[in-house]
Amino acid sequence: MQAIAKNDIKTGTVVDLTHEGHGVVKIDRFPIFIPQALINEQIEYKIIKVKKNFAIGKLLNINTRSENRVAPPCIYYERCGGCQLQHLSYEAQLEMKKEQVINLFQRKAHFDNSKINDTVGMTDPWRYRNKSQIPVGKNEQNEVIMGFYRQRSHDIIDMGSCLIQDSQHQEVMNEVKSILKDLNVSIYQEQLKKGLMRHLVVRTGYHTDEMMVIFVTNGKNWPQKNAVVEKILDAFPNVTSIKQNINDSHSNVIMGRQSITLYGKDTIIDQLTDSTFKISDQSFYQINSEQTEKLYNKAIEYAQLTGNEVVLDTYCGIGTIGLYMAPHAKHVYGVEVVPSAIEDAQQNATINQCNNTTFVCGKAEEVILQWKAQGIKPDVVMVDPPRKGCDETFIQTLLTLEPKRIVYISCNPSTQQRDALLLAEKYQLEEVTPVDMFPQTTHVETVALFNLK
């Protein structure tokens, strides 16, 4: 193999894209990963890091451009870590995400008879985030800065706009930056673990336009809070709720456990099709409401509900998917390990007048065995776990339960593929549909249908 050393300048043709969107050039089968390089491009690049099994390169010049390359519309794209694919046409982004799923399920796991559908995309793949989490800091000139982190760092890129956030959120961000400066509010400095203001979080109801503004502070004492609230309401009279969240943990976790309502309601309301949901500052709620409706509609299609089925909604959160399915089912049982989420789910069931739902707090693998002992046998099980996927104990419990169908929603196809191999003992993976919940990024969500053999 050719010698490869740091700072070498080389040329080559990009032959593949990684799941992180990096171009792959190979030298005698040795891969070099190059951010922002695209398949079939002939490029010049510099080796910046060499490892045992791969190297990292920096793109210097593009000698032959891909037909899928586009000019990134965001002026911060080269520095900000929020997006990874703005230089790739949206049609090619959707195809890349489908290829990622094909690679996981067919090429690696050999689910050769399982159908992989086209990625479900957006008509307008911008301004889709209904929640913004914006770090606050100071620059070298001691000026207040707000924006998003540089890739793989905690260096804040001071930004005036973000093309994937709700446009109202950037208006709030810019106003808050001015308010913090004018009122001389103490700013948290991560390295020193001193200062007050840590993050600004903004949540918006996609269909209702209700807005919640949350200030995350390093401690409860905040002398200027009344003045800040007054200025926010002067600038944005449509704000429904203003809250202070207290996080003095000095960790990477954005929000703490205690929140104080400074103005308005404790929650905001949003709708998904015909269902209404209360959302608190801490609630898990899908970031992209438009795509969530498409995702849930596909899940209902897979569930094949006629009104006579018992549905078990595991990892149910605030009850979004369970309540979405309730009008089409005989009864929905939801289980979630987070107590506050179950409280939200029960309130959401009341709001939606769903009398055919039961929500219980506990570990799914334990609660479903209790339900089994009570004679409750689900026809369909909904699974929507966090990125780490399902606990193996839960999978084994599910296999003993033997529902007719399992509908598995995942925000991490890699762990979904791992779990699919365990489910294959008794279930046939019929098909997988990728859904583009986060355009311009490498993330892809999937919904899969498993039928009992």
UniProtKB/Swiss-Prot annotation:
Q: Does the keyword Transferase apply?
A: yes
Q: Which PANTHER family match?
A: RNA M5U METHYLTRANSFERASE (PTHR11061), TRNA (URACIL(54)-C(5))-METHYLTRANSFERASE (PTHR11061:SF30)
Binding positions for S-adenosyl-L-methionine?
Q286, Y315, E336, D384
**Which keywords accompany this UniProt record?**
4Fe-4S, Iron, Iron-sulfur, Metal-binding, Methyltransferase, S-adenosyl-L-methionine, Transferase
Mind listing the GO biological process terms from this record?
rRNA base methylation
- Phylogenetic classification of the source organism: Bacteria, Bacillati, Bacillota, Bacilli, Bacillales
Q: Per its UniProt record, what SUPFAM superfamilies does this chain match?
A: Nucleic acid-binding proteins (SSF50249), S-adenosyl-L-methionine-dependent methyltransferases (SSF53335)
Locate the active site.
Answer: C411 (nucleophile)
Gene Ontology molecular function, alphabetical: 4 iron, 4 sulfur cluster binding; metal ion binding; rRNA (uridine-C5-)-methyltransferase activity
Top-level class of the enzyme under EC nomenclature = transferase
This chain belongs to the protein called Uncharacterized RNA methyltransferase SAR1988
Q: What is the E.C. number?
A: 2.1.1.-
Q: What is the originating organism of this protein? A: Staphylococcus aureus (strain MRSA252)
Task: Please give the superkingdom of this protein's source.
Answer: Bacteria
Entry similarity comment:
Belongs to the class I-like SAM-binding methyltransferase superfamily. RNA M5U methyltransferase family.
Q: Where does [4Fe-4S] cluster bind?
A: C74, C80, C83, C162
